[in-house]
Amino acid sequence: WLENALKKLPSDVEAINFNLYEDNGDKWSVELVGTSTFDENNSDWACNEVYTTRDNPYVLTKKSDWKAIENLFTTFLLNYLERGKYAHTLKECRGIGIGFVDGDLSLIYKK
C-alpha cells in the first residue's frame, strides 16, 4: 500500500502526514496525505492537501487502543524510513507527521 502511494507522489508535495482513523469493529485506517506546505510550529500544514490516498486507505484489524495503534504505525514508518524501497522519496520531503485526525500530530522526520 505505502509503496504504491509513494510511486504516485506528485513533485509539488513538500511534506507528508499519515492520518489515522479509528473505524468500527476493531478496525483502524491510515491515509497518506501529501501537502504543499510544512511548518513544524503549526500543525495546520497537514491541511494543505495536494495528494491523498483517502479513497484507498490502509486498513488494519486489531483489538487495541488508539495509543498502541499510533505507536505501531509510527514504528512501522520509522523502520520504512531506514530501509524501505521508497525511503528516499519520503526523505525528500521537508517533514513527515503522523496522528489521529482528531488529535495531535507527531513529527517523525524533519529535513
Question: What is each PLM-predicted segment?
Answer:
Residues 4-42:
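Amphipathic, interaction-prone secondary-structure segments
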Residues 4-9, 39-42, 49, 53-111:
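Acidic, proline/glycine-rich low-complexity IDRs
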